[in-house]
C-alpha cells in the first residue's frame, strides 16, 4: 500500500475566503483547565497560514465522547434557551480561550456548531471562529451516510474551502472528516496532516534500510493485522509488552502468571514462521523484570533468562533484552514504534520503554535514523521519557496510525484531493 500525496493548503487560494479547518482539539481537560495543549499547538501553522494569506478561519473539532442529540431534536432544545447536546465536560470553550492566548488574538466561540450562520456572516479576513464540539450532534459519527451528509451540508455552507488537519480522526467516516469535502467537492491537507502522510508513506513505501518495527502492548490479537502487514516490509521485529509472553509460551518458555492469550499460541507460532520465511529477524525478551503482584515495588525480580518463575508476572523487559534492542536499533536506518515494552506508568517497570525511546532519539540525532512513533501509548511514553522532540515524527493519531500500519485506507485521507 502506498499513500498518495494530497493537495496541500499551500496550493489553495485563501485570500478573502472563509476556510473550514477540521482540527483535532481532543485535549485532556480537568475542571475546565486544559492539562496538555500539544494538539492545539500542533494546529497553529495551518491556522497561521490561512490568516497570513488574508483569509478567515472556521475551526471544527470534537472533544471526548459526549452522548449527543439528533438534529431533529435540536430546535426544541434551542427554543428552551439551551445548547443542543451540551455537556460541560466536553465543551470546547476552554480550547477557544487557550487558542486565543497562543494566537495573541481573540477567538470567537460559536456555542452551537449547527447554528453559527450569524457568527460566520460577521467574519472579516483575519478572524478565527471555533465551533462548539461537533459530537454534540449524533450525525457527526452516524453509520448512515445521509445523516452525516445532512450535518455536513450545514457546516459546508459556512465556508468556501475545506482543509483537514485532523489525522487523529482520519480513520473515521464522519460528517466533518468525509462529509464536508463530499458536499463541497474538494478538500486539501493542512500542514499536520501533510507531515503525517509524508512520514507514513515513507515507512510504508520505500524506507531507508534496514527498517525495524518495535511492537509492544498487551495483546497479540490487537496487533495481528499490523504484524502481518509489517512482516512484508521490515528487516527486524522487536517484540515487548505483555504480548511478548504469548510468543514466549508458544516457543515453550515458562511465563509464570504473566498475561498470555492462550487461544493465540498457534497464531503466534504462525507469525514467527512467517517472519522466518520472509527472512525477518525477530527478537523476543531474553530476560524480564518481574513481581508476584501487579504493583510498583522497590526491588522487583530480574530473571536470569527468558523463563519466568512460577508465581511471578513479567512487567518489563530486562537489562539483557534492553541491550539487544538498543543494539538492533543502532544498526537500522528507519524505525517505527507502536506499543510500550512494559508497564511504563509505574517507575520500576519503565526502564525498557524509556531505553527504547532514548535509543531511537540518540540514533535519530547522531546517525540520521528516520524514527516514527505511532500515536497512543507510544507517543505518551516518548513524551514522558523526554525523547519526543528528538524523534523524526511523533504521530498525533493512535487509531489512525495503527490502521495505516495494518495496511488499511483511511477515509479522512482518501477523500482529499490528490496532489496535481
UniProtKB/Swiss-Prot annotation:
One of the protein's GO biological processes: gluconeogenesis
Binding site for AMP: 219, 223, 242, 314, 345
Residues where CDP binds: 217, 222, 241, 339, 344
Molecular function GO labels: ADP binding; ATP binding; metal ion binding; phosphoglycerate kinase activity
Subunit structure: Monomer.
Name listed for the protein in its UniProt record: Phosphoglycerate kinase, cytosolic
InterPro entries in the record: Pgk_euglenozoa, Phosphoglycerate_kinase, Phosphoglycerate_kinase_CS, Phosphoglycerate_kinase_N, Phosphoglycerate_kinase_sf
Annotated GO CC locations: cytosol
E.C. numbers: 2.7.2.3
Natural source organism: Trypanosoma congolense
Positions contributing to Mg(2+) binding: 222, 377
Major localization listed first in the record, in broad terms: cytoplasm
